[in-house]
């Protein structure tokens, strides 16, 4: 009898371990996307309150959400989905395990007793404050510089909108937007592939305009008192038809001193150092335009 119970227990443990392993493989193949990561157990904080959408914003958001959004990428703090017509991206904040609904499932005891987990928890709350502040400020002060259409942080009951998400396995999810933290943004083209295409087609005037847009974007943010703490041009900046924008809106930090020309001019040069190197190595015909634009600040 005891032997049979031990065998059943062992088989149960083996089955659970196998299922957990299979689940982990599926999770990785699905772009590390899980619907659970979108829902937080945090209480609404007045610090993150944002105005209700205007009638114009409400209509624009509703029009954008009439289509499905397909899995695009997992960033440092968000999942991104692109619209069927490739005009929009919707990003959802990806909450750490201890901030999710049913947080005890992942680490039922360690966040209470493990010093390492306590440090991780403190770090996560600090990063959350940085990210949500950046989302809020991007919506309130930097819409032109970020292409943000609408931002929602705290749980609410007034949006009454849903969006259909499609993950990498083609599974579909209906998400109530009142319940999650999200940013609806214009979809932008990446900078370096665009430069490469224009240069190979010898559309040098358009390529020069791209360079101008990038420099003016960084300058505009500085003049409004914001700097980017993750200034990777190749993945975090993009191009719309008429301007460059910040694709990543989670690391834009308030810095009043950067408003001064003696501070923002060297900052712009530093931020575009990688661009200058690319021009030197790959697009030498465009280097003079870069130098002229930077020197005219």
Label each PLM-derived region with a short phrase:
Residues 234-236:
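Conserved protein-kinase catalytic-loop position immediately C-terminal to the HRD catalytic Asp
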Residues 1-3:
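N-terminal hydrophobic targeting signals that begin at the initiator methionine
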Residues 5-24:
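Hydrophobic membrane-insertion alpha-helices, especially the h-region
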Residues 202-210, 223-229, 239-297:
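C-lobe/activation-segment region of protein kinase-like
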């Amino acid at each position: 009898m005891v032997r049979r119970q031990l065998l059943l227990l062992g088989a149960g443990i083996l089955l659970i371990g196998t299922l957990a392993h299979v689940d982990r493989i599926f999770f990785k193949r699905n772009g590390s996307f899980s619907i659970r990561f979108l829902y937080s157990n945090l209480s609404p904080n007045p610090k993150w309150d944002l105005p209700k959408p205007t009638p114009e914003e409400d209509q624009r958001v509703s029009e954008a959400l009439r289509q499905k959004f397909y899995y695009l990428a997992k960033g440092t703090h968000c999942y991104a989905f692109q619209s069927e017509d490739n005009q929009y991206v919707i990003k959802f904040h990806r909450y750490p395990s201890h901030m999710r609904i049913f947080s005890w499932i992942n680490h039922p005891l360690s966040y209470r007793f493990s010093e390492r987990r306590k440090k991780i928890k403190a770090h996560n709350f600090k990063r959350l404050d940085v990210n949500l502040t950046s989302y809020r400020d991007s919506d309130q002060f930097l819409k032109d510089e970020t292409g943000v259409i609408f931002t929602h942080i705290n749980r609410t009951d007034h949006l009454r909108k849903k969006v259909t998400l499609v993950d990498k396995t083609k599974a579909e999810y209906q998400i109530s937007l009142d319940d999650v933290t999200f940013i609806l943004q214009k979809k932008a083209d990446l900078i370096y592939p665009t430069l490469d295409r224009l240069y190979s087609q010898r559309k040098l005037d358009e390529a020069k305009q791209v360079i101008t847009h990038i420099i003016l974007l960084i300058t505009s943010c500085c003049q409004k008192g914001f700097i980017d703490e993750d200034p990777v041009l190749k993945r975090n900046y993009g191009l719309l038809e008429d301007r460059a924008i910040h694709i990543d809106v989670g690391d834009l930090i308030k810095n009043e001193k950067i408003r001064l020309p003696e501070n923002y001019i060297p900052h712009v040069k530093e931020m575009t150092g990688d661009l200058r190197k690319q021009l030197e190595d790959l697009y030498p015909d465009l280097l003079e335009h870069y130098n002229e634009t930077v020197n005219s600040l």
